[in-house]
Amino acid sequence: MEKFTTHTGVGVPLRRSNVDTDQIIPAVYLKRVTRTGFEDALFAAWRGNETFVLNQPAYTHGSVLVAGPDFGTGSSREHAVWALKDYGFRVVIASRFADIFRGNSGKQGLLAAQVAQDDVELIWKVLENSPGTEVTVDLAAKQVTVADIVAPFQIDDYTRWRLLEGLDDIGLTLQHADEITAFEATREPWRPLTLPAKHLPAVPITAARPVA
């Protein structure tokens, strides 16, 4: 996972509250078996409306989404984070996030920056009055800068550390690679191993239902 320190990109104002994961990416797209290529699914139900913000030329290449409160509610699906990242978003700013969405975001390298609603309102006004305005997000300083607005944001220390270090779950595990290798080299032979089956079961297996 790429380290996140600061990011500057075009801000996209999404004046909608309670945006749930099914609105972020409809369930029909979850049938895909790949982990990438979900950019076309992002906000699919809304993008058919030509007035939707992502259909406006000034915002099509945005990378900082500024949303309403309670973003990411609904069912837990990593695909919501994947769709946002595949489209090009690095940061989502909102005054409140669903806990599971916030957790999934941190694990996938998407920064969920919690900003006071009064500051979100000010940022929206700037982005709507001056489409294409860039937003700078400084994770080290926990600060968002838009034009003359400087707003602090909240993020838990553990997620902030993971993003700064660029550590997803696999990266965290690989930090202990030497310890894992040493353990495997000295583990007792009687401990169970996960190996492919090398023989048929000693007892015949009877199908629960007749096989045609």
UniProtKB/Swiss-Prot annotation:
Q: Which Gene Ontology cellular component terms are annotated?
A: 3-isopropylmalate dehydratase complex
GO MF, one term, reads:
3-isopropylmalate dehydratase activity
**Enzyme class per UniProt:** lyase
Record-listed E.C. numbers: 4.2.1.33
One Pfam entry name: Aconitase_C
**A biological process (GO) annotation for this entry?**
L-leucine biosynthetic process
Listed under catalytic activity are: (2R,3S)-3-isopropylmalate = (2S)-2-isopropylmalate
The domain of life is: Bacteria
Which pathway features in its UniProt record? Amino-acid biosynthesis; L-leucine biosynthesis; L-leucine from 3-methyl-2-oxobutanoate: step 2/4
Membrane spanning stretches: none
**Keywords recorded for this protein, A-Z:** Amino-acid biosynthesis, Branched-chain amino acid biosynthesis, Leucine biosynthesis, Lyase
User: What Gene3D superfamilies is this protein classified in?
Assistant: Aconitase, domain 4
Mind telling me which PANTHER family this protein's record contains?
3-ISOPROPYLMALATE DEHYDRATASE SMALL SUBUNIT (PTHR43345:SF5), 3-ISOPROPYLMALATE DEHYDRATASE SMALL SUBUNIT 2-RELATED-RELATED (PTHR43345)
NCBIfam families from the xrefs? leuD (TIGR00171), PRK01641.1 (NF002458)
Which protein family is named in the record?
Belongs to the LeuD family. LeuD type 1 subfamily.
Quaternary structure (record):
Heterodimer of LeuC and LeuD.
Q: What is this protein's function per UniProt?
A: Catalyzes the isomerization between 2-isopropylmalate and 3-isopropylmalate, via the formation of 2-isopropylmaleate.
> Can you say what this protein is called?
3-isopropylmalate dehydratase small subunit
Gene encoding it? leuD
